[in-house]
Amino acid sequence: MHELSRRNNAPICGKDFKTGQTLIKTILAPGFKARMIGLNGWFSTNILGNRDGEVLEDPGSFKTKEESKLSVLEHILQPELYPDLYGNFTHKVRINYYPPRGDNKEGWDNIDIFGWLGYPMQIKVDFLCRDSILAAPIVLDLVLFMDLAQRSAELRGLGIQEWLSFYFKSPMTAPGLYPEHDLFIQLMKLKNTLRHLRGEELITHLGLEYYD
């Protein structure tokens, strides 16, 4: 893919849209990390009855999906930097094909966290959603942004459009570069890239100018 991109001077950006359960993880996990809330375990199960669910019945296909889902928490929580909080959490992901559910996907999460003095707590999330309804707007956004990247000499020369990682479970990055999965950092990078292209001041949220 990288070679094709270089050969054709075409932009590339990522794999596997971030629409359901992984979207929720990339919203919640940065909050835990920001408040230094520890994590003992995160159990995730999915019920879906569309073609995606049928394909994921195959162990080989599920393995690829599982790897992209599992990697998100480690990249966000950085257990090597915060071993007392995130150095030993258990992360399980299950996907169940259930034809009566059709395109209506259910993502259920049990999250075991702990706070000050190690006191355990739990969070339960039951996300009942529609797979295609969540994915379709991403397709529309990416058509527009990839067209912009193709027309922009500055972006086209990059090849990998890391600024579009906001939309993906597996964003593409330059070789050896740490992939960013925090949804809010991804959104800031997306907005600032667009502002940079327009020659506008980048968003920092510093806010000191309000108190001059």
Regions of interest found by a model, annotated:
Residues 61, 65-154:
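C-terminal and late-domain segments of enzyme folds
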Residues 6-7, 35, 51, 94, ...:
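Arginine residue identity/basic-tract feature
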Residues 4, 26, 30, 138-141, ...:
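Alpha-helical scaffold segments in soluble metabolic enzymes
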Residues 14, 20, 31, 38-41, ...:
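Residue-identity detector for glycine
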Residues 114-212:
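C-terminal active-site/capping subdomain that shapes the small-molecule cofactor and substrate pocket
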Residues 10-92:
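Conserved anion/nucleotide-ligand pocket segment
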Residues 1-10:
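Rossmann-fold NAD(P)-binding glycine/threonine-rich loop
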